[in-house]
């Protein structure tokens, strides 16, 4: 038994430790990522509560324009019944059942408040649309960051592969007595730098995964499954995109709401009328007090003098309108600038991408020629290392340029109000 236990301990001691399995990262297509972000992101849900709140305010404003019905019950006990020989005028115990029905028949101020509350729902809805666009743009930019990180890893892996191949060649030459330790150390240094750069690129990818997962309200990192295609319109009509941008639509709604408030200012001092119906039942009835009675009342109210309050309130509302119009003008200027800059950026980055791709091809050719020349003794490894760095930098430039083109196209669609669909 002891021999068996000892053998088991030896087997467990020499058995290799089970390596942890890598966690599978969920990959999501671009359109699906945008849809999930708009459905599940807490920021969108929080913005949507403003619509529900505006609707609740509308219901509250409408409530004061509808009939109100109240009921009352009261019991009265006197020290003794009151009356004379002809009968009792007030019984000692008496119960009164009453009711009140009131209805505003003329309420311009209340009606105006209801209209304002209805306009506020439109403002809240458009403001929520603007928040949805902001979340969608943040998701798209993070998605592009994931793609860029993947490209950068490919560049670093290719550069590290070249550096390790050169290091292997330098070591073989040194071992064969044909190379120098200096060349081997230079090649080793370049390989170590490549390993560090690859490690940094992989960490950047991990950070992008986590950021995308947060935006999609996922409990874990999310990867990109493919590259999005941003279709840029061939022609741009300002009259069209101005009606598509959520920020302009929301600000226009704010201006209209403020203008309505100013137009309705006179209703604050307009006459108001209210009708009320008050039935009553008393038991037991007194001699001079019938058991069933009712009263119908119509009251009319007209403010005559408010000490200048209405004039001040109207002026304040006019200032709010002016501020909203100024804000709208500023947004329109900014929007036109964003469209112009986005169009210029797309054209410029397209040209830059073509240039850096050509430069990358030439850098790869230079690296191939330099490596071959070094192997036949025509150059030193300094030229090889320099060519490797140039090829790596050219690959990085291509990755950045491709990302810049995609971001410029996204910015143009956002500026035109065409993203998200």
Label the predicted regions:
Residues 132-244, 342-345, 349, 369-372, ...:
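Periplasmic alpha-helical coiled-coil/stalk elements that build and connect Gram-negative outer-membrane
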Residues 22-26, 72-105, 223-234, 263, ...:
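Small/polar, glycine/serine/threonine/aspartate-rich low-complexity segments that form flexible
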Residues 5-15:
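Bacterial N-terminal signal peptides
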Residues 35-45, 52-67, 98-116, 126-133, ...:
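A glycine-/polar-enriched beta->alpha junction
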Residues 20-72, 80, 103-105, 118, ...:
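Bacterial Sec-pathway N-terminal export signals of envelope proteins
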Residues 54, 61, 68, 124, ...:
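Hydrophobic stripe of amphipathic alpha-helices that form coiled-coil interfaces
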Residues 19-22, 79, 397-421:
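Acidic, low-complexity, intrinsically disordered peripheral segments
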Residues 33, 40, 47, 103, ...:
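Amphipathic alpha-helical coiled-coil segments and their boundaries
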